[in-house]
Amino acid sequence: MSNFIFISPNFPTNYWQFCRELKNDGMNVLGIGDQPYDELKPELKDSLNEYYKVGSLENYDEVYRAVAFFTFKYGRIDWLESNNEYWLERDAALRTDFHITSGFQTEDMPRIKYKSKMKEYYQKAGIATARYHMVDDFEGCKKFIEEVGYPVVVKPDNGVGASDTHRLSDEEELRTFLTYKSIHPPDVSYIME
């Protein structure tokens, strides 16, 4: 029987259905989460072979120990997944640390997390992508905008969804954005398209 660890199987609330179908397919479904077992939906409880509660999914050491426990108890882990973009890097680190080869590893993260790195892979696949510039200073951005014209869209190079996305339509908005960037986590890299 294959062992499948599902990280945070309770969120979103409909994810129990993934666990049910994995179990129906003959997998040994093992959940790791920070919600108390007694608060899990009955459907989720029925879909898991075992659940390990951690204090916080943000604490890598706790989650690591939970995976180690399941490995000791059930043997080699074949799959580990959360189906949640927020946990992509955590999932990859656990797969790498436990030699679980059925998914992204730590070394794969840049090409799937950074918009600028994704473009290279889209181009290799023949998918057109918008030209881009990594936001640096006014002169560098202005030079790029002279090539492509306004409006441009600026967003974090490594980000989930559309949060912190800015549409710039003129030089004044460009200056306003660059001021914003200098005060709001200045270590965040932005991509301009």
Predicted regions and their residues:
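Conserved ATP-binding module of the ATP-grasp superfamily
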Residues: 128-131, 151-154, 167-193
